[in-house]
Amino acid sequence: MARIAGVNIPTQKRVEIALQYIHGIGAAKAKEICGKVGIPVERRVHQLTDDEVLRIREVIDSDYKVEGDLRREVAMNIKRLMDMACYRGLRHRKGLPVRGQRTHTNARTRKGPAKPIAGKKK
């Protein structure tokens, strides 16, 4: 089992699919990485040589932000918005939708479970 960017990559899957197990790499970036390294997309991970795995690792480390670094950057961006006290930061702080969605109904994922209101029983 190959280990790239701190993630165990499944060996039986195609390289293009297996790279998507890394946080921060989707379908487009996986194809791009395969193109840079010169690996056919349909090749399986267990067919890769150690040199090819090393080249994939180097490309990801030099060109992309993945896993912990990406998570940390996203968290820092949200924290920066909250510290600035701009509209988006206030929405994050209150646990409400940030991108303009309605909250009169819906938004249960962001707001959490519905809180019962006293005297509302029928």
Swiss-Prot record:
Residue ranges, annotated region (Disordered)? 94-122
Similarity comment text for this entry:
Belongs to the universal ribosomal protein uS13 family.
- Full protein name: Small ribosomal subunit protein uS13
Superkingdom is Bacteria
Question: Cytoplasm among the record's keywords?
Answer: no
Q: What organism does the UniProt record list as the source?
A: Rhodospirillum centenum (strain ATCC 51521 / SW)
This protein's GO cellular component annotations are: cytosol; small ribosomal subunit
Any single Pfam family the record assigns to this protein:
Ribosomal_S13
- Keyword Ribonucleoprotein tagged: yes
> What role does this protein play?
Located at the top of the head of the 30S subunit, it contacts several helices of the 16S rRNA. In the 70S ribosome it contacts the 23S rRNA (bridge B1a) and protein L5 of the 50S subunit (bridge B1b), connecting the 2 subunits; these bridges are implicated in subunit movement. Contacts the tRNAs in the A and P-sites.
Fill in the subunit field for this protein: Part of the 30S ribosomal subunit. Forms a loose heterodimer with protein S19. Forms two bridges to the 50S subunit in the 70S ribosome.
One term of GO molecular function: rRNA binding
For this UniProt record, the keywords arranged alphabetically read as follows: Ribonucleoprotein, Ribosomal protein, RNA-binding, rRNA-binding, tRNA-binding
Name its GO BP terms in alphabetical order. translation
